[in-house]
Amino acid sequence: MDSAESPTKTQAGEDENYSLLCQAHEQFNNSEFDRCLELLQELETRGESSGPVLRHNRAVVSYYKTGCTQHSVLLKELEALTADADAPGDVSSGLSLKQGAAAATVARYNRAVIYYHRHMFGTALEKLAPLVARLEALEKAMAALVATLQLQLLLATNQLNRAEAFLDYLQYKLNLVATAPSSNAAEEAAVVGTAPPSAATNSSVVASPGGAAVEGAVPGLGGSLQLLQLITLVLNRKPVVIQEDGTPEYAALKAQQYYIMKDFQMAAKQLMRINNECTQAGTITPQLSTCIANNMGVIHLRVRHYAIAAKFFQNALNFDQQLARNLRQSTLQTMSSARSCEILYNLGVAMLHLRRPKEAFQCFLVPVKQFHSNPRLWLRMAEACIMEHEAKLVEEERQSQSETPSTKPYAPQSAGVPEPTLEFAVLCLRSALTLTQHYKTRFHMAAVSSEDVEAPEPKDPTQESWRHPQDNNFCNPSKPVSLESLENMMAAIYAAHSFVSLRLGDHVTALEMSEKLLACERLSDAHKLLGHMYAGEALMLMDKASEARDHLDPTFVGTLNAFDFETRDWQLKSVDAAQNVVRYNLAVAMALQNDLPQAKALLANLTHSLVANKALALRRFMDLKMGPVPGGTPS
């Protein structure tokens, strides 16, 4: 956040007022906030014409005086200040703010900073938009501040393509960041001198260490923009060499680059090195510990070490809770560092893989309040509900076999109650389906516009060009999704919706969802099998056995890919198992149509352990229904 601004003398006849403002600025830097406020009040009583400047500075000083915790009070004052201004920069003042930026401009910037630290990124982008629109007209220092915040917001909202385009705009139009070296061999050789020899042979883009990212004497901004430049390139999978400067920020970015390159072992080693070095130096903080523990959990989750990942996420949550004990009385920096929602999301996914659905559901309840537009999160909640219900069925079956009657039979629950029930799963799946259908429409619109361009156009570093790229960031806080990922998620939602509807006796919806599942593009073989099975079961339950037989034709199973069935916790581990299950269901459909001889012949070939007992029971039922064979002897 911009602090109380240092004065700039603009009129020779205001020496006394200028001296008082200099004293106020000195008192602010010395943390003498009471004395600073007195000097600002004295300036106001003198009829100083820089009313908006004094008003802004007084609000900032009062904010610092209260320990930087009264964000709402400062925000109201800043909103009132910007409301009084017709447009950014219209305020003319005798004693102007640092680098000539107007009070209303800085107030707008500070408002966006507050929203950013509160994790209200969309609102922050909206408040910052007027300043970004006139970025070229701002003073160099103010433009660098606005550009830095805008780039941070684009990255925070996973608008990676737009962030890269905005970075090009800052490089080629405003010259606020160092231009990335070209992949041209001659130009690359000129940059190699600032990088290790190995870096030149492995990368076409080299980040020169220590290069000034901002021209002019703007302390602190150069390094900040340079780091954001590297983060943008890494997240967009651009080849770039990261020169570590001993700070954990660059070291952590190096670990993230390893992770994106799927070198998970090196990513974990890099994070452990950061932890060890900072611990030995005594510079470890709860924020850094939270980041390291969460990222270690993500790495282990990626390599399917779910129990270890869950342990790291729990450690990260403990570190984060040290920061978020009382957010209402926390500073903006502490509030910005809190990551409980993201960590709980990760922990919930790990718990699902560990088949602990109740714990997973409780974890998802917190992030869904913030990321309620994420269809993948709604699907995960539905999966937790389904898994919990199936676990209860297994327990009830075990109790029935041990002759211990269940004392609490299943009863329908309210769909609006956030409990891991099938009724709430339906609500989650409806939300996921509505969001995914909406995002798929938007995705295709963006995809068509991008495919129209056959050859890459030269970069156009203008104010409007960086706004053109679109990002499919539909699943925040996760990274943008691909079209294939979106279609897979759509298929998973249809399959889960059909399954839950069958469990709840809603056969019409189950059939509708299964038919939509079979109509999906790029459908995996596993989902194709589920679609036919669910459709066949729904039709049989609707007394439409003849139509169900069309979905239970076992010939389609032979064309399925066996690798699609190698899913953890699936009972169908092979094509042979799938063939037996489909044939058994087909025999049931035949039995319902009284085609008993053909059904009995089909059952004779079912030997897989999944259906052997059920096939034997069905065969005995048909024997009883068909009666004794003429001339036969009783067995």
Curated annotation (Swiss-Prot):
Localization terms from the record: Cytoplasm; Nucleus
Keywords on record: Coiled coil, Cytoplasm, Nucleus, Phosphoprotein, RNA-mediated gene silencing, Transcription, Transcription regulation, Translation regulation
InterPro entries: CNOT10 (IPR039740), TPR-like_helical_dom_sf (IPR011990)
Positions with biased composition (Basic and acidic residues): 456-470
Keyword Transmembrane helix: no
Main location: cytoplasm
Function: Component of the CCR4-NOT complex which is one of the major cellular mRNA deadenylases and is linked to various cellular processes including bulk mRNA degradation, miRNA-mediated repression, translational repression during translational initiation and general transcription regulation. Additional complex functions may be a consequence of its influence on mRNA expression. Is not required for association of CNOT7 to the CCR4-NOT complex.
Subunit comment: Component of the CCR4-NOT complex. CNOT10 and CNOT11 form a subcomplex docked to the CNOT1 scaffold.
Protein name per Swiss-Prot or TrEMBL: CCR4-NOT transcription complex subunit 10
